[in-house]
Amino acid sequence: MQVTTEAVSGVARRLNVSVPTSRINEQFEARLKRTAKTVKINGFRPGKVPANVVRREYGASIYQEVVNDIIRDSVFEAIQQEKINAVGMPNIEKVEHKEDALVFEATVEVYPEVEVKAFDGLEVERKTAEIKDADVDTMIENLQKQRQTWAVTKGMAKKDMQVTFDFEGSIDGEKFEGGSAEDFKLVLGSGRMIPGFEDGIIGMKAGEEKVIDVTFPEDYQAENLAGKAAQFKITVKQVEKPKLPEIDAEFLKIFGVSEEEGIEKLKADVRKNMEREVRNGLRNQVKQAAFDALVAANEIEVPAAMVAQEIDRQRQQMVQQFTQQFGGAGAQSFDKSMLPDELFKEQAERSVKLGVLVSKVLADAKLEVDQARVDAYIDDMASSYEDPTEVIEYFKNDAQQRAQIEAVVLEDQVVDHILASAKVTDKAVSYEDLLKEQQARRMG
């Protein structure tokens, strides 16, 4: 077999393969003999069919099978012979039967060979944040709000109060589907209703009626209502103000704090959890910034096959999240056509490029996972659980789970390696702003 290779692009190679006709003939004759031993043809006993009859009846199909098998086998032999780091399946083209050889072309995508630019040209913003006493107080207040109750008031409805009311909507004097409800509960300021609706209720008292004018957003999900002006008749039945629980023995007990330890122990525990959250948030932020800079500075071409695989992975991940959120029944009714390739393509391309670049950085720097950092990472994560020892043992005994942590730590080591040479600018942010940024990153 003869093979020549030419570069089609940075990530594709064209193989010109020539297979001697003798190889095809040998395999054809051998398969013809095997077929003659098993084929059943009327008028002949099994295994006694003459070779010329088998050749006449099955020769063409057997020959095509042999050719297909030889093309398949020889293209992979050629890839191995030429030491090509192939990704995805080869594409067979221009098959030609010559007198002395079977000749064909095969195009195959290859893993990118890249050179990473020096890190000293990268600019990375590294954010810093400190937990202040006011942040801890706000967090404890949030814990109280999560367990708040409601107390009826005769006063006016204000933001953060809960209102029970009836409403009846109309457009040009005509009622519309879904525009009415009774005993509807709404926390003012929650943003559950269309713009202007909640503002119209603020200031009302129990027993009052009012008609408010609002306009449905242009992008409202119900197309028959989008952009239209509507009137809602509001009848307030009850106004309730939030009542926070006292920070007493019962409240402290919820968080594993005794009455003797008191509020200071709760504050210390809350601060510890917040500091862990900040560490993780800052680590993720600088990792994102460093990797963004790395990808932006290194324009590389990646194989479509790798991008397609990453698209499939991200799509499957989204389906799994949908299944976890809505259960098996919801997953069965889920239409995957709602998740076209284009939805994931941009992120998938970035992910593949980043993976190639990070792998190259690891190889060039000869980085290996720091097991001490892995243990420290697990210890830090386990400290948020009721029984840290159990969590530590879990990761110690589950190789697959530990491997996932090792991958995260190895990425952190790559980031440290980049930051050691990059132009890093530190920027202090508040705890609140850091949380908002984390939430925005999770949302997309």
Curated annotation (Swiss-Prot):
UniProt KW Isomerase keyword: yes
Reactions that this protein is recorded to catalyse: [protein]-peptidylproline (omega=180) = [protein]-peptidylproline (omega=0)
Subcellular location per the Swiss-Prot or TrEMBL entry: Cytoplasm
Enzyme Commission number(s) of this protein: 5.2.1.8
Family matches, as InterPro entries: PPIase_dom_sf, PPIase_FKBP_dom, Trig_fac, Trigger_fac_C, Trigger_fac_C_sf, Trigger_fac_ribosome-bd_bac, Trigger_fac_ribosome-bd_sf, Trigger_fact/SurA_dom_sf
Key words, A-Z: Cell cycle, Cell division, Chaperone, Cytoplasm, Isomerase, Rotamase
Gene Ontology MF terms in the entry: peptidyl-prolyl cis-trans isomerase activity; protein folding chaperone; ribosome binding
Domain notes: Consists of 3 domains; the N-terminus binds the ribosome, the middle domain has PPIase activity, while the C-terminus has intrinsic chaperone activity on its own.
Function: Involved in protein export. Acts as a chaperone by maintaining the newly synthesized protein in an open conformation. Functions as a peptidyl-prolyl cis-trans isomerase.
Protein family: Belongs to the FKBP-type PPIase family. Tig subfamily.
Record's protein name: Trigger factor
Gene that encodes it: tig
